[in-house]
Amino acid sequence: MKDIKNIFRNVEKRLRASRWFEDEWEIYNRGTYLQLAKSNWYNGSQGGVHFETYIEAPQVKKKAFPVCMHAEEDCPSQAKFIDDFLQLEQARIRSWKGYQVIGDGYSICQRELPLNFKNLEERLLEELNRLRQLESSVDKVLQSLVR
């Protein structure tokens, strides 16, 4: 089995080297768990709005792992944020292959991917870049809630 931590390190390096990755973007990488967020998304303690993926023992056993978007307890007006955000982006998310809109608790959307080490790094980058397209709507909804 390939070293998942190494794959996540490479994903982090490649995200940081991307044209779009600027000072306001942040990555929290805990080995086999990674979050991507912007500094204004209330994610300083990993409990705000973020894109997330992880491959830990249960995912290895299941041979599948999630790529998801969360708005956790540090997100201002969490339930309203999720409702307003999904009003803007639900159709787009549903159009993406394999994505489920959840909108319950802190989960906004998720895609479960098969754990195939052959293209794992590329798949992770592809999905995080897809979720990153939601950036402007996250910013817009957060700005409307904290005026």
Label every PLM stretch briefly:
Residues D83-R147:
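Charge-biased C-terminal accessory regions appended to nucleic-acid-, cytoskeletal NTPase
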Residues M1-E112:
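Polyanion-binding interface signature
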